[in-house]
Amino acid sequence: MSIKENQLAELAAQLDKCSSCHLRNDCQAPVGWYGCPDSPIVFIGEGPGGVEDDYGCPLIGPSGQLLDKALWSVQMTRDRVLTSNIVKCRPKGNRTPDLAEADFCAKIWLERELAILQPKVIVALGSVAMHYLGDPAMRITRQRGKWFKTPQGYDCIATFHPSYILRQYGHAQVQAKWDVYHDLQLARAKAVETCPDYNLCSEKPVDLFAEFQKRSG
């Protein structure tokens, strides 16, 4: 194992035991991260949903399946990037985590992940991730597709969360998909610019359901 892999394994063992806030009371277990620690690009969503809680993998449900298709369209695959979330435990009823919950959890876990990973590019999936990594005053409809620096100095670009696209219909959904495609192209280009020798795409998309077993209980 590489140094990063060892450090993430130690962090994952600590995460499994986390009971620092009330969100832990309503989920099966915390959900960590997935992907390659050496990737120059990290995708950060808001938090686990029901399917993610069942399987212990971020973005494995309908939103994650749409993300996989979007990544494939710009020659990236989930095993060659890294995906994580702002909060690690599923909020009750799959609700959106509030700012206080996001801030509390991310400062304990996400900040330590990023300190290990040192990504060249971060893609904030949706408003929750964008607000934490950027500014709570930002609006996703205005900020998406534009670069900004996180407080820690990482280059970050925001785009719509896949769940937002799934809630759209007709022309609005088509437009949102094109917007995300454009944003992912920008993110990929910067990742390639910073790490030209890193391969962002495997020969075929990863089947996460074949890789992860459903949790019991």
Predicted region positions:
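A polyanion-binding, active-site-adjacent surface
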Residues: 1-217
